[in-house]
C-alpha cells in the first residue's frame, strides 16, 4: 500500500469524486475511521481556534484529536496550504503523527508533487 497516497490531476478531472469513492469503499468494507476534509476546512478549523477568544489548550487538543484519531485521513486540494504557514506546521505535525502510527493518508492536489517546496 502507498502511504501517503497522492492523487494529482488538473482541476475538474475527478479527484474529489475518486476520493469520495475510496472513502466510501473503506467505510463500507472495514471498521476504519475515515475523515475526508478539504484543506480549506482544515485551515478554517485551525484559524478559528488560533483566533478564538477561548484560545486554550483544550480547543487545540480537540482539533488535534479530530484529525489525528482516525485510521484514514483524506485531504483534498492540499495546494491551498501553501500560503498558510502556521497551518502548514500544524498539518505537518498531524501528517507525521498519522504516518508514524501507520495510519493511511490520502492527499489530492491539482499541483504536481514535484512543484512543492
Feature names for model-found ranges:
Residues 27-30, 65-68, 72-73, 96-104:
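Conserved catalytic network of the ASCE P-loop NTPase/AAA+ motor domain
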Amino acid at each position: 500500500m502507498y502511504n501517503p497516497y497522492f492523487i494529482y490531476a488538473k482541476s475538474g478531472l475527478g479527484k474529489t469524486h475518486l476520493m469520495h469513492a475510496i472513502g466510501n469503499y473503506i467505510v463500507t468494507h472495514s471498521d476504519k475511521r475515515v475523515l475526508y476534509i478539504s484543506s480549506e476546512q482544515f485551515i478554517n478549523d485551525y484559524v478559528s481556534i488560533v483566533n478564538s477568544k477561548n484560545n486554550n489548550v483544550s480547543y487545540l487538543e480537540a482539533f488535534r484529536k479530530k484529525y489525528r484519531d482516525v485510521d484514514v485521513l483524506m485531504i483534498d486540494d492540499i495546494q491551498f496550504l501553501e500560503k498558510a504557514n502556521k497551518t502548514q506546521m500544524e498539518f505537518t505535525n498531524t501528517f507525521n503523527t498519522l504516518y508514524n502510527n501507520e495510519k493511511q493518508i490520502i492527499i489530492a492536489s491539482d499541483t504536481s508533487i514535484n512543484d512543492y517546496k
